[in-house]
Amino acid sequence: MTVRARTHRVIQIGWPEFGQAVYPPPTSSSELQQRVDKLRARMDERKLTHLVVYGDREHFANLAYLTGFDPRFEEALLILSSHGTPLLVVGNECEAYVGVSQLFNEGKLRRERFQPFSLLNQPRDQSRTIREIFAAEGLNAASRVGCVGWKYFSDHEHPNAQYAIELPSYLVDTLREIAGHDRVVNSTDLLMHPGYGLRTVCTPAEIAYFEYTSVQASESVKRMIFGMREGMTDHEVVALGGTCGEPLGCHVTFTTGRTSALGLSGPKDERIVRGQPLSMNLCYWGSNSCRSGWVASSFHDLPVPAADYVAGFAGAYYEVMSEWFALLKPGTPGGQLWRLIRERLPFERFGIFLNPGHLIHLDEWLSSPIYANSDVPLHSGMAIQVDVIPSSPVYASTRMEDGLILADKELRKQLSDAFPDCYARCQKRRKFMTDVLGIELPEEVLPLSNIPAIVPPFFLAPNEVFALEP
């Protein structure tokens, strides 16, 4: 689709209600098994006899994707061979928690306790060594082992990228003692590469869960925006958001006053003061909702150098983001989105340093096809984060960060059949973005947030939001 350049405006609206999402059922054993089978097919293509998938509290997503289990505050390791039932190796306190996995409950996943995966000084005298476990799973000098952690490396990052493995040394050292150094390689890309990683193609079940957490996160941000008042502390504002109990995908951030320049900071007992910039986010597994603006009712409350914040900064950003949305079609090279942002929002003024958009999954940042000269095409099933972060010493920032799904006709039909209420809410959000905000969307774009592209420049006047001229 071609999109004509549009000029921003500020309109007065009541924020729409799109409805609450219902917590979807857990991922079925059949879907989990399909993921394992697909991964085994990739193993076969690379002539791997075994794959080990590591997880801990921070780096859980690959493990959870394959098993429905995350190791909470322990470590865990999935050992997958070319055939047979996979083995999940866990610590003391996760031994019972493995029951969260539908694969395990149906006998399609084995479990073994390896006590060194537990917290320090807990019992460690009732499990085999990791070498014994590996040997029992058939690893030997003839094995070729792929390791999956949380990142892989390019040739310019490491001189021997395929052998650079981020898993704990005590695991990798043991694997290499058994199979040899060159027969143990980094295979994280099989799940995380933006072009072909398995987790870059979401199923209807994943979309329904991501929509659920997106609704929870965005409704919390909405409550914070409408509830904040001058004189409150940042902790008090964050408390207004509330949390639903789902695991967080990253730390809650809230910056203002002395923390304004500390982008990843959480609340630090700063007061809400008129004339200060403010940014906030809440992130669950599969979602992240963030807004940035000013504690103000109008431009009259801003510092004099920032008085043209709407026309000179945030409005221009909104205009270009409408063009960014128009490029969200299967087949668009990621480099085209990067080039749009770099050319239309020059770094010297807008300071956009990170990728202008990335993939999100259970982890807040899966990977990104959007970078300089990227020829990685967007494809159906991608969960894309509208994460384009401007930064200015004068204007601070602005943001419309939420998530969306890129879904072709077939995937939309599957979602509509399996989760009709979820699909209907996505269509309502599309209609609002198009009819009220003036943002033209490709038919493949399914917004997941309940505050889709709603950006108030001044948080003390939240019903005044950006839109585009007709």
Which residues make up each language-model segment?
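Active-site neighborhoods and metal-handling regions in enzymes and metal-associated proteins
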Residues: 1-470
